[in-house]
């Protein structure tokens, strides 16, 4: 995926979940952050981000990448489905209703839910970085589909290439993490795709697996 017209900026403060005050081109502006996660390791005062202009009525900028450990990581979750689509067969149908819920894609008897991951510790990619009731509901929907004879998938878009394996984040959301490990791979097939940014292109860096050498104690810490 190619990115053009990106401009360097610096975070001043996060106003709310979706608005961030930035210093860009010598001016203080408000930028849209399309990611509901906490992003504490990326979105903090003084950190560098890459932004692009938008035609929004109030927010004239959109944050695309944030810097961490000397590299830029995609933090625009609005692009996750576009990225995932490149790994799905032609004809995959987006935003499919299943009862009162929606799953990101369907292709024949396969249902695919897409999640984005930016959090890493000790080489381990982790999701979520904030409690996600919606994510848990998606897992339950995938379980129901699998029990009905369909094939259920979670595609994790990990927008960094410095990770060796994935593990659900027990410390942040033990309910989601427990459900994830119960369902994967018994009911749900998980795909962990990693990506790196070279300044112009977000490139696929390969797939990783579920960590086999990670445990969690009663306090849920990795």
UniProtKB/Swiss-Prot annotation:
<dbReference type="InterPro" id="IPR005224">
    <property type="entry name" value="SfsA"/>
</dbReference>
<dbReference type="InterPro" id="IPR041465">
    <property type="entry name" value="SfsA_N"/>
</dbReference>
<dbReference type="Pfam" id="PF17746">
    <property type="entry name" value="SfsA_N"/>
</dbReference>
<dbReference type="Pfam" id="PF03749">
    <property type="entry name" value="SfsA"/>
</dbReference>
<dbReference type="InterPro" id="IPR040452">
    <property type="entry name" value="SfsA_C"/>
</dbReference>
<comment type="similarity">
    <text>Belongs to the SfsA family.</text>
</comment>
<protein>
    <recommendedName>
        <fullName>Sugar fermentation stimulation protein homolog</fullName>
    </recommendedName>
</protein>
<dbReference type="GO" id="GO:0003677">
    <property type="term" value="F:DNA binding"/>
</dbReference>
């Amino acid at each position: 995926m190619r990115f053009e017209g990106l401009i360097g900026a610096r975070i001043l403060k996060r106003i709310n979940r979706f608005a961030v005050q930035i210093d860009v081109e010598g001016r203080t502006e408000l930028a849209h952050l399309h990611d509901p996660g906490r992003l504490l390791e990326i979105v903090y005062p003084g950190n560098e981000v890459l932004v692009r202009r938008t035609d929004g009525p109030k927010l004239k900028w959109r944050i695309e990448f944030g810097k961490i450990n000397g590299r830029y990581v995609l933090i625009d979750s609005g692009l996750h489905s576009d990225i995932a689509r490149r790994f799905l067969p032609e004809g995959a149908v987006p935003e499919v209703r299943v009862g009162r819920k929606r799953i990101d894609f369907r292709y024949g008897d396969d249902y695919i839910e897409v999640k984005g991951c930016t959090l890493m510790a000790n080489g381990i990619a982790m999701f979520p970085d904030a409690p996600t009731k919606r994510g848990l509901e998606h897992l339950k929907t995938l379980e129901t589909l699998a029990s009905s004879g369909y094939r259920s998938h979670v595609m994790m878009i990990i927008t960094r290439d410095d990770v060796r394996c994935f593990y659900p984040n027990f410390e942040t959301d033990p309910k989601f993490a427990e459900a994830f490990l119960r369902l994967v791979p018994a009911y749900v097939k998980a795909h962990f795709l990693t990506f790196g940014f070279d300044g112009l292109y977000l490139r696929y860096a390969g797939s990783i697996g579920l960590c086999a050498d990670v445990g969690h104690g009663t306090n849920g810490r990795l």
